[in-house]
Amino acid sequence: MIEAKDKGCQTIVEATPLGLGRDLEVLVECSKKSGINIITCTGAWDGANVRGKNVPKAIRESTIDEITAVWTKEFEEGIDDTGIKPGYIKLALGDEGEIFPLQEKILRAAARTSKKTGKVIQCHIWEASSLPKAVQIIEEEQLPYDRFIWVHADGQMDMDKILEFGKKGIWLEFDTLGGAVDFTKYPQAIRKLQEEKLLSQLLFGQDSGSYWIKEDEE
């Protein structure tokens, strides 16, 4: 991080929610020692086909309104007794081509929290076929499209869906460049977004921040 600071990095958007290893003490220490601002999040992560494994029990057993109340309180008062407030809502869902009930619940809670707080939803959706259902849900919750970021929009590079939902107003995040073997699809996609006047909705990130421990290390 110090090296990143020296190269001009000022802020890191840190996307680890509760249940996936969020550690505020570590984030505070890293921020102080590096001089980089770190934006933490609230939310829940149910990607990678793990069926709720990384979603805390309290969220799994709570109603939409109960989850909304907890997340809203974190934005208004801070997380637990730390005084640290998250900057956005992080979700992961839909990696099996459909959105399961738990995933729908956290998405609706996120939409309601966003409406109360004005905070954006950063939503991991690798399987592009799940996006229409996710957008339908936020439409039912009457959430403005520009409060929703489609993380891994470049995962399958489904240009039909990228253009369709980009035109609705959602944010499009390209973040798999770090592990890409073929880079030719990126300039082609970016050129198409430019032609459709959607470049202002394109975000770039690096999806390389996770460390998955082995079963025998848990």
Ranges and model annotations:
Residues 2-6, 27-35, 75-84, 112-115, ...:
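Acidic (Asp/Glu)-rich catalytic clusters
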Residues 2-25:
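Glycine-rich, N-terminal phosphate-binding loop and its surrounding beta-alpha-beta segment
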Residues 10, 87, 200:
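Short acidic/polar active-site loop segments enriched in Thr and Asp
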Residues 17-18, 43-47, 94, 126-128, ...:
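Active-site beta-loop-alpha junctions enriched in small/polar residues
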Residues 24, 49-52, 130-137, 158-166, ...:
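Histidine/acidic-residue-rich catalytic or RNA/ligand-binding cores of hydrolases
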Residues 29-32, 37-120, 171, 176-180:
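Active-site gating/metal-coordination segments in enzymes
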Residues 116-184:
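Active-site core of metal-dependent hydrolases
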Residues 122, 175-176, 199-217:
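Short acidic/histidine-rich active-site segments
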